[in-house]
Amino acid sequence: MANISAADVKKLRELTGAGMMDCKKALEEADGDFEKAAELIRIKLGKKMAERGAEREASNGLVATSGGALVELNCETDFVAKGDDFVAAAQQIADAADEAKAGDVEALKAVRLGDKTVGEVVENLAITIGEKIELGRVAYFDGPVVAYMHKRAADLPPAVGVLVEYDGAEAGARGAAMQIAAMRPQYLTREEVPGDRVAKEREIAEATSREEGKPEQAIAKITEGRLNGFFKDVVLLEQPSVTESKKSVKAVLDEAGTTVKRFARFEVGA
């Protein structure tokens, strides 16, 4: 068996963030092999975190952006969310997503970040910090993009992030990104709204009109009006502009010479 010194234990503790006794036992089991000992600790602590975290929610966190990538990284508390290690890891993961052009969580988890995968980086971060940490969402767009990030409080990292892919003038795209952050549209055009959802909204609007005792001959028109109101809530191009309330977002974008091709909006906890 290798001779394990206090310096060896300290070195492994600094490397993994595990307790002194866990580090000593891992080094003994690995016969002094640091790489093997670190892996043993990661497995052991990872199992403990999984057991403890099964019923815990990672409903805090932040949104980070890099180039054409937008990433949400979740944790349990805002205290961890604003910590330097968590913020730095989120930015590194966003950088990795942009470089690899990774547009979904599983693909991003497999991307190499130094000598580890992104998935392993997230696991190690959870072990070091001691909270449930999850890679929540990721989006990647190829074309020209603008990003807009919003903080809920000055001392917290961004909790809302928007990524807009566009053609034409950048200024219009920036305005659209702010609109998306504030008004939470779910679709770009009404054609993107699933047919079953439109049918359900139409059914609700019609039933509401009848319950209110509206004249039968007026129900069809009232229903269409209410359905148009629904579209104004959920469709970006049909929303009233937050900067020019008498105009739709589409009208403002047309005047700016901007076409929004697609967008992503991530909000921590939503």
UniProtKB/Swiss-Prot annotation:
Gene Ontology annotations for the cellular component aspect, listed alphabetically: cytoplasm
Role summary: Associates with the EF-Tu.GDP complex and induces the exchange of GDP to GTP. It remains bound to the aminoacyl-tRNA.EF-Tu.GTP complex up to the GTP hydrolysis stage on the ribosome.
Lineage of producing organism: Bacteria, Bacillati, Actinomycetota, Actinomycetes, Propionibacteriales
Pfam families xrefs: EF_TS (PF00889)
Species in which this protein is naturally found: Nocardioides sp. (strain ATCC BAA-499 / JS614)
Residue ranges, annotated region (Involved in Mg(2+) ion dislocation from EF-Tu): 77-80
Name by which UniProt lists this protein: Elongation factor Ts
Subcellular location, principal: cytoplasm
The UniProt record lists the keyword Oxidoreductase: no
